[in-house]
From Swiss-Prot:
Organism domain of life: Bacteria
Taxonomic path: Bacteria, Bacillati, Bacillota, Bacilli, Bacillales
Annotated positions of the Phosphoserine modification: 122
Family the UniProt entry places it in: Belongs to the NDK family.
Name of the protein described by the UniProt record: Nucleoside diphosphate kinase
Coiled coil: none
Amino acid sequence: MERTYVMVKPDGVQRNLIGNIVSRFEQKGYTLAAAKLVTLSKETAETHYSEHRERPFFGELVSFITSGPVFAMVWEGEGVIKAARQLIGATNPSEAAPGTIRGDLAVNVGMNVVHGSDSPESAEREIAIFFKEEELNDYQKDSNKWV
């Protein structure tokens, strides 16, 4: 089963948006395999966002993502990586479609509420940064036959 990493960023946690975001994934029939509230260390943040290391906004990004707790999640289901990206919406909220998480909830590109893996490779790498294998739950929901 395909898995993806989704993280509610500090602005989303502070604005009490965790439940709203979780509900959107549940309503699409995806299964929550793992979740935890954690405040990232600078080292973990730099590892997570390593592909942006040479970008001018890297320092601000690391500072923001370590400014408070994040809600780290692993979702699973068929096509969940692509579906999560569609649910999340464009990085810049002003370009995100209404009905997407960022289109409905994000304030600006710097505080865009949520992160989601953009590929199977990213999902695997990001899940491994935040979760040990034994923290990932593998179960079948009875409701799966209905969605």
